[in-house]
């Protein structure tokens, strides 16, 4: 959940980094 919220807060760049 925390990771999902973090990637969402990044907008897009964070999501790619998370993956």
From Swiss-Prot:
GO terms (molecular function) for this protein are: oxidoreductase activity
Record's protein name: Cytochrome c oxidase subunit 6A2, mitochondrial
Function of the molecule: Component of the cytochrome c oxidase, the last enzyme in the mitochondrial electron transport chain which drives oxidative phosphorylation. The respiratory chain contains 3 multisubunit complexes succinate dehydrogenase (complex II, CII), ubiquinol-cytochrome c oxidoreductase (cytochrome b-c1 complex, complex III, CIII) and cytochrome c oxidase (complex IV, CIV), that cooperate to transfer electrons derived from NADH and succinate to molecular oxygen, creating an electrochemical gradient over the inner membrane that drives transmembrane transport and the ATP synthase.
Where in or outside the cell it occurs: the entry states: Mitochondrion inner membrane
Q: How does it assemble?
A: Component of the cytochrome c oxidase (complex IV, CIV), a multisubunit enzyme composed of 14 subunits. The complex is composed of a catalytic core of 3 subunits MT-CO1, MT-CO2 and MT-CO3, encoded in the mitochondrial DNA, and 11 supernumerary subunits COX4I, COX5A, COX5B, COX6A, COX6B, COX6C, COX7A, COX7B, COX7C, COX8 and NDUFA4, which are encoded in the nuclear genome.
**Pathway listed:** Energy metabolism; oxidative phosphorylation
A biological process (GO) of this protein is:
oxidative phosphorylation
Q: Which residues form a coiled coil?
A: none
Q: In which tissues is it expressed?
A: Heart specific isoform.
Identify the main location.
mitochondrion
Q: What keywords are annotated for this sequence in UniProt?
A: Membrane, Mitochondrion, Mitochondrion inner membrane, Oxidoreductase, Transmembrane, Transmembrane helix
Instruction: Give the bilayer topology.
Output: Single-pass membrane protein
GO cellular component terms given for this protein: mitochondrial inner membrane
Family per similarity comment: Belongs to the cytochrome c oxidase subunit 6A family.
Q: Which domain of life is it from?
A: Eukaryota
């Amino acid at each position: 959940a925390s990771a999902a919220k973090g990637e969402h807060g990044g907008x897009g760049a964070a999501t790619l980094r998370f993956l």
